[in-house]
């Protein structure tokens, strides 16, 4: 039974999702240092270019080869500019489930890229990898992330009280950790009936070696 994700590229009408590479270092560092990323994710701060190189060269490959997950750069098809990141984590190969999360660069918000990339990834997981469940967790006050989950057809399953550590600006400009709730969403193959039809017609899955 497959227990690691392949090196994959996924294309939609506007985006290409692919493995991170050295050319992404500067844009990845800039994206990860954004205040919204700091507030709602566990990405260590400050996140400099050295941290970006370690993420690309060590963390992301290790997650994939160990079977825990997959990191995909989200890039614009026409410009090849990095506009986000899709992550799979906590993968259970027996249950065929994984946890999906997404980050959108501040220069690319409001374009619908997060939902397009998340839907493309979900479609690939269900059709190509034969997964049966995708889980998403969002901080209770992270309404933008919740809107993405709802837009791609996720079903809200409930609240994990006090399970999330977010960060908030203090009066002196520093960041303080704040405990809050997680809202848990799930997506099953049947949830994409209708909602994923447009992508199913336009999406393409290729090995990264073929695409590169």
Residue spans for each PLM region:
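Acyl-donor (CoA/ACP) binding surface of acyl/acetyltransferases
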Residues: 1-35, 75-212
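Conserved GNAT-fold acetyl-CoA-binding loop/helix
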Residues: 36-58, 70-72
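A generic secondary-structure signal
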Residues: 58-62, 124
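Short loop/turn motifs at secondary-structure junctions and domain boundaries
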Residues: 62-68
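A generic structural signal for short beta-strands and their flanking turns/coil linkers
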Residues: 68-70, 96
